[in-house]
Amino acid sequence: MSNLSNLRHKLQNGLIASCQPVPGSAMDTPEIVAAMACAALAGGAVGLRIEGISNIQAVRRATDAPIIGIIKRDLPDSEVRITPWLEDIDALSAAGADIIAFDVTCRERPVSVADLYQRARATGCLTMADASNIDDGLLAHHLGIDFIGTTLSGYTQATVPTEPDLALVTQLAQAGCRVIAEGRYHSPALAAAAISAGAYAVTVGSAITRIEHICGWFCDAIKQCETEKLTEY
């Protein structure tokens, strides 16, 4: 089995932990990101999704587990945020990413999806498409991109849904894609549902690594209960 085939096999039917702290939060340091990554692996995660060069370098020093690397940018002339530039591809590979993920949505962009894919292939890394719909995913699949993520489903519109897009997982899987289900998988039951729907692997982020979000969910539920109690009187 080749190294790339072995890497694909490691992820199959597994959990990928996205260790991306809230920007500027108390957890937003490379050392803490690396610690979160190691804790996730100790809990059974088979891979990691890490943003930023310094974070990837820190995680790579701590583990040889598969890393999906991304760089997020806020561009003045494009809504594309995830790994938009060719130099991002080179930097991610040099930092230690095994898989390079990039936005493949049909939006105005500084570099074409095909050019990003070719540059990532040239580094020897595997590739992942962050798609928003079936058209994005199929285009990426036909280009030869190794993994198709549902990462951006619901995030290219004004209102973000509360539930994950299991229908998109099924559509892509039936088309022969290696689907990495991602986006709003906030419970073990939803992660299992993604595998049942045909996902190759499932990425979970906020529900594992963003303490602010998790605490917010609990606080909201408690407040809702308090409101319901008050309306009873």
From Swiss-Prot:
The cross-references to Gene3D superfamilies, in alphabetical order and at most eight, read: Aldolase class I
EC number per UniProt: 5.1.3.9
Among the record's GO biological process terms, what is one? N-acetylmannosamine catabolic process
Q: Which InterPro entries match?
A: Aldolase_TIM, NanE, RibuloseP-bd_barrel
Membrane-crossing residue ranges in chain numbering: none
Biological role stated in the UniProt entry: Converts N-acetylmannosamine-6-phosphate (ManNAc-6-P) to N-acetylglucosamine-6-phosphate (GlcNAc-6-P).
Alphabetically sorted, this entry's keywords are:
Carbohydrate metabolism, Isomerase
Write one Pfam family the protein is assigned to. NanE
Full protein name:
Putative N-acetylmannosamine-6-phosphate 2-epimerase
The molecular function terms in GO held by this entry are: N-acylglucosamine-6-phosphate 2-epimerase activity
User: Which reaction equations make up its catalytic activity?
Assistant: an N-acyl-D-glucosamine 6-phosphate = an N-acyl-D-mannosamine 6-phosphate
Q: Does the keyword Signal apply?
A: no
Organism the protein comes from: Yersinia pestis
Report the pathway entry. Amino-sugar metabolism; N-acetylneuraminate degradation; D-fructose 6-phosphate from N-acetylneuraminate: step 3/5
Q: Which family does it belong to?
A: Belongs to the NanE family.
Judged by the first EC level, this protein's enzyme class is: isomerase
User: One GO term of the cellular component aspect?
Assistant: cytosol
Could you tell me which PANTHER family the record lists for this protein?
A: N-ACETYLMANNOSAMINE-6-PHOSPHATE 2-EPIMERASE-RELATED
